[in-house]
Amino acid sequence: MTAAARWRDHSGSAFNQGASTMAWARGLSAALVAACATFLQLTPAAAGPTLDAIRARGLLVCGIHTGVAGFALPDSRGEWQGMDADLCRGVAVAIFNDATKVRFVALSSSTRFTALGSGEVDVLFRTSTQTMLRDVTLGLRHAVTYFYDGHGFMVRNNLGVSKVADMRGATICLIQGTTNEQVTADYFRSISVPFSPVLYERTDQASAALQAGRCDAFGTDASQLAGVRSSMPRPSDWTILEERFSKEPYGAYLRRGDDEWFDLVRWYTYAVIEAEEQGVTRANAEEMRRTSVNPNTRRLLGVTPELGQSLKLDPAWAYNVVRTLGNYGEIYDRHFGPTTPVNLPRGPNRLWTQGGLVYALPLR
């Protein structure tokens, strides 16, 4: 055999061995991928420390507003009513199937994030705007936007003010620790109009100061102005100016470092929205769970168990939430709808299919 023939024989043998090795490796990789996929499908997410602690104590601790109609305000029996209060109750239903297993902690704007970071509360549903600096500097996470708003001003009708530019030299009530402080200062500076801020710790204090004439205007998010006005003795004496000066996307806030708890609160919120998108209501949830052939509806209502398994919740968790509290639109209408004192049109808080900004990511 010549040297060239020996080289051809050797190289061909080596090539065949290498090809066999590569084929074996590819087969092993495919088997590992399939095994991992099967494991992920069959293994529900482990509960994080926050969910474990909530289950151990037997109730959710939820941070809410100190008092503003529409979001969180005690009724005549001392029970908290409002969208944020109901969203807290919904988390309790998702975990315990019991809307009463929640303790509300009323927090001012200046103390809310400290209370969450220290572990005093498990979650904030408290008219809290997502901003870049809050996201990157506080050690907290914004779960998902559930309400879209903007900064506005409310004045007494007889003040003769129709736009913010008319408010030169005005004294303006603001809430300490909110985005509204900076928004107001930035806007008045941009139009070269001087003003005097007066800061208060709570919304009810600022409202009282406005009604007593210690301020010419009250500046905060328009939805909260509508709530404040609805609680005044003579709401018709007050005007909320039409101009809006900021984007104020509200969402639940949670501590960083517990991804499982973040996922639960995030996808719970989307489920409430998804229920409205699919037409599932308090009244028809039971029937739709029993009769719907829509795969998305069956997943949402727990006929098939994968959504509950992935969050380590009962398969019927979202069904229980909607059956107890309603879908997003029902919750909104209960606290802001035309039959309420607040009477705030949905505007950007309509579903995306109706020209709004609200939609759920796919629950699948």
PLM regions with names:
Residues 42-47:
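Sec/Tat signal peptide C-region and signal peptidase I cleavage site
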Residues 89, 93, 97-166, 223-246, ...:
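Acidic, polar ligand-binding/catalytic clefts
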Residues 29-41:
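Bacterial N-terminal signal peptides
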Residues 7-8, 15-32:
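Bacterial N-terminal signal peptides that target proteins for export
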Residues 86-95, 157-161, 165, 170-171, ...:
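Extended ligand-binding regions for polar small-molecule ligands
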Residues 48-125, 328, 351, 355:
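Extracytoplasmic small-molecule ligand-binding "clamshell" domains
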Residues 310-364:
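C-terminal functional modules
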Residues 59-70, 80-95, 129-130, 149-201, ...:
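Bilobed "Venus flytrap"/periplasmic-binding protein-like clamshell domains
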